[in-house]
Design a protein with these regions (language model features):
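An N-terminal, well-structured beta->alpha segment
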Residues: 5-101, 190, 195-227, 235
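Gly/Ser/Thr-enriched, mixed-charge loops and adjacent short helices
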Residues: 10-14, 32-37, 41, 149-277, ...
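Conserved phosphate/anionic-ligand binding catalytic regions in large, soluble enzymes, centered on
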Residues: 37-57, 141-144, 231-243, 298, ...
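Buried hydrophobic positions in well-ordered alpha/beta secondary-structure cores of metabolic enzymes
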Residues: 46, 86, 124, 137, ...
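N-terminal small/polar loop signature for handling phosphorylated ligands or for N-terminal nucleophile
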Residues: 85-148, 245-246, 250-304
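Short acidic, glycine/serine/threonine-rich loops at helix termini
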Residues: 95-100, 125-129, 147-153, 174, ...
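Phosphate-binding and adjacent anionic-ligand microenvironments
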Residues: 286, 290-292, 313, 333-530, ...
């Protein structure tokens, strides 16, 4: 079907009056018709994410139901436990979509647990494992703008779905009609016992599990730490207060962002990676006692921090900087207690700062680099678990503000990360220092590794094709230098080949194939290019290494300028 065929198919369906009116309002808007009906919203390992609205290429109760039916059909075809867990965030329609998913699972005879209120994404990962489920779903679009929502899908280990089951779910979805009516209502399945709410007991078990990951809780209780916290109108408010409150942290909450708000009126793009995400926090922190600012994204799997600079302003750490600062803190504290097991590992994504490798090596711990996506960090935990050695996982992080200590969940967790940030800040406060002081010491000790992430966003109906062409052009035309530094090696993760340009020697990359290209600049740094898995854009990850911060910054600026042309 072309886009008009799809549009007419929807117009002829038995739909609620408000949806019919929405469809009628775009009848003469060709661009809107193509956007909404140019295809079906795609399902992948991250599930589905898109703008909410009527249409086959939009997120609505029909596309969500179809995706959940595909998940249910896949689960029914496996030997996995016929149980599912579902969570949802603060976005518009999140609770509705969660209930739609629950009904789809119940129709397939799958016992379904649904969080009784909005909950962070890592709590869903925890629930899948704790309740022994075969799969899980979170309704969330993470840090996207308010017009978006999504369906994040999880496997039995609490990781986001891997390629093989996701491909099967996609195939199942393709066989399902859009408008198959529900056999029973949500309330009827609740009465039947096929759908059950996840109540306070599991929340408390999660809190205790997170608290058990504290490195030095008594130290934190005695530090008198003051933080300013924003949940960015999302799910972090309750669990962050519960965990940090038990540890004696004094919390000032940003009032205008404390309550759930699907419009995100005070922060249009609630992404903790951006400077603007903490703007309201800066205002509050000027008049409140503050050792550190914490901000969690709407589904509370990512966290960002800022620290007072001593001159009335604040310095926001990058996701990389917070990652290697937490890594250094955990390794230093556990080394002091002689508490690091032999063969211990830490894990980072390939696009995260290699400065972390130097920190891990200093403490005699292996650092593994995996593909982007926290499921690959979770995969390393699974390997240890299969050997009966899960305690050897120390810490994992991604530069996009995602961190995990512990094996209770298999996705990044802003709650445990917030606790670790407070521990780090408290330990430094007791020494008369702050996180900025410690960051300067880390750079001085391990080297000046400066990082920058650049997103090139593409537009138009063929935006994804443009992203693919950009990657193909980079493969075909390898630059001799970037920012004045010679390109010494090229790693093509799609071909699983690393090539030394001087010798021509090729080696195999022992990672799953992925559309990622890395240019190594010897000991000067690297540039990595990868298309987004969910949006029409290509991301460039820069690392520049210098003898001092000024040299590293000069190289970084030259690298970005060249690749931006």
């Amino acid at each position: 079907m072309n886009y008009m065929d799809r549009y007419n198919f929807w117009c002829q369906a038995d739909l609620p009056e408000e949806i019919k009116q929405e469809l009628a309002s775009i009848r003469n808007d060709e661009e809107e018709l193509k956007g909404r009906f140019g295809g079906d919203l795609q399902f992948g390992t991250a599930g589905m994410r898109g703008i909410m609205g009527a249409g086959s290429n939009r997120l609505n109760r029909y596309t969500v139901r179809r995706a959940a039916q595909g998940m249910a059909a896949w689960l029914s075809s496996t030997d996995l436990p016929q149980k599912a867990a579902i969570g949802y965030d603060s976005r518009h329609n999140s609770q509705l979509f969660a209930e739609v998913c629950a009904v789809a699972f119940a129709e397939a005879g799958i016992q379904t647990w649904l969080y009784d209120r909005l909950a962070p994404t890592p709590m869903l990962s925890y629930a899948v494992r704790e309740l022994g489920c075969g799969c899980g779903i979170v309704i969330s679009a993470s840090h996207n703008a308010g017009a978006y929502n999504g369906v994040k899908c999880y496997g039995p280990d609490g990781c986001q779905m891997t390629d093989e089951p996701a491909a099967i779910v996609t195939e199942k979805i393709s066989t399902i009609d859009f408008f198959v009516p529900e056999t029973k209502s949500f309330a009827e399945y609740m009465a039947d016992g096929l759908i059950t709410y996840i109540g306070q007991d599991l929340w408390e078990r999660y809190y205790e599990t997170v608290l058990a990951e504290a490195v030095d809780p008594e130290m934190l209780k005695n530090a008198g730490l003051n933080i300013v916290y924003t949940p960015l109108c999302g799910t972090g408010m309750e669990p962050v207060h519960a965990v940090l409150g038990k540890l004696g942290v004094n919390i000032t909450t940003v009032a205008c962002q404390a309550k759930p708000d699907g419009d995100f009126k005070t922060c249009e793009y609630p992404n903790p990676e951006t400077d603007a995400a903490l703007n309201e926090s800066y205002k509050v922190a000027k008049d409140a006692p503050c050792d550190v600012i914490l901000g969690t994204d709407p589904d509370a799997d990512r966290v960002a921090i800022a620290v007072p600079d001593g001159q009335g302003g604040f310095v926001k750490l990058s996701g990389n900087e917070l990652g290697f600062m937490l890594l250094d803190y955990v390794l230093k504290a556990r080394t002091a207690k002689n508490d690091i097991p032999e063969g211990a590992i830490t894990v980072r994504s390939i696009v995260s700062s290699p400065l972390a490798d130097r920190i891990a090596a200093y403490y005699g711990v292996t650092m593994k680099a995996v593909l982007t996506g926290f499921k690959y960090i979770g995969g390393e935990i699974l390997k240890l678990e299969q050997k009966g050695e899960p305690e050897k996982f120390i810490f994992g992080f991604e530069e996009s503000c995602g961190y995990l200590k512990g094996t209770y969940a298999r996705d990044k967790d802003a709650i445990v990360a917030s606790m670790l940030v407070c521990e780090l800040a408290a330990s430094l406060k007791l020494q008369g220092k702050n996180i900025l002081d410690a960051l300067a010491e880390v750079y001085q000790k391990y080297g000046f590794y400066l990082a920058h992430v650049q997103s090139i966003e593409l537009t138009g109906a063929d935006a994804m094709e443009k992203a693919a062409k950009m990657m193909a052009d980079l493969r075909a035309q390898v630059p001799a230098t970037i920012g004045g530094a010679a390109v010494t090696d090229v790693r093509d993760y799609k071909a699983s080949i690393a090539k030394n340009l001087a010798t021509g020697e090729k080696t195999v990359i022992d990672l799953p194939k992925s559309n990622v290209l890395e240019f190594l600049l010897g000991d000067k740094g690297s540039v990595i290019a990868r298309p987004s898995g969910t949006e029409p854009k290509v991301k460039f990850y820069y690392t520049a290494v210098g003898e001092n911060k000024e040299d590293a910054k000069k190289l970084l600026d030259a690298m970005v300028a060249q690749m931006s042309v």
